């Protein structure tokens, strides 16, 4: 076996939450009378650092600090998270990889405390050696 360990991304890879990310950012864009985006545009322009992504969408951080829009998005995402599902076949794929002898981890830009909860809520904790998010938001 050439590879022994698989590192997964959480948002958009295991978790089918792109629709919620688009919905959340569009709420913030609408509030500021900025042009809303589609899922296709989101996939083209989203990047890290997230502040740069917001600026590309038209947010002006001379008028309002990034933290205001960022916190607004995080609050909306948290409020609606219960609607988010895993991508199809995630559980069976993780199980098959575990049976095949691969160890697995998650590396995410999501806040650690939320990431731990989200993985647990979706019943996936048993598949991962390490679940690593960020310490700040």
Which residues make up each language-model segment?
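N-terminal helical cap/lid subdomain that shapes the substrate entry/recognition surface
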Residues: 3-88
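Small/polar loops that bind or transfer phosphate-bearing groups
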Residues: 17, 106-107
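Hydrophobic packing residues within well-ordered alpha-helices of enzyme cores
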Residues: 25, 54, 90, 115-119, ...
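Short helix-capping segments at alpha-helix termini
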Residues: 30-36, 99-100, 123-127
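Residue-level recognition of specific faces of alpha-helices
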Residues: 44, 53, 93, 127-130
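Short, acidic loop-to-helix structural element flanking the phosphoryl-transfer center
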Residues: 78-106, 112-116
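Substrate-recognition "cap/lid" segment bordering the active-site pocket of phosphatases
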Residues: 83, 112-137
């Amino acid at each position: 076996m050439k590879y022994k360990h698989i590192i997964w991304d959480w948002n958009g890879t295991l978790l089918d939450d792109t629709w919620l990310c688009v919905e959340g950012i569009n709420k913030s864009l609408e509030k500021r009378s900025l042009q809303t985006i589609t899922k296709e545009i989101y996939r083209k322009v989203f990047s890290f650092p997230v502040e740069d992504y917001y600026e590309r969408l038209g947010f002006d951080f001379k008028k309002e600090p990034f933290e205001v829009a960022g916190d607004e998005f995080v609050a909306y995402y948290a409020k609606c998270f219960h609607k988010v599902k895993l991508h199809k076949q995630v559980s069976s794929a993780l199980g098959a990889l575990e049976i095949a002898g691969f160890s697995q981890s998650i590396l995410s830009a999501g806040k650690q405390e939320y990431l731990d909860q989200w993985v647990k809520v979706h019943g996936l904790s048993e598949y991962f050696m390490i679940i690593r998010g960020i310490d700040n938001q």
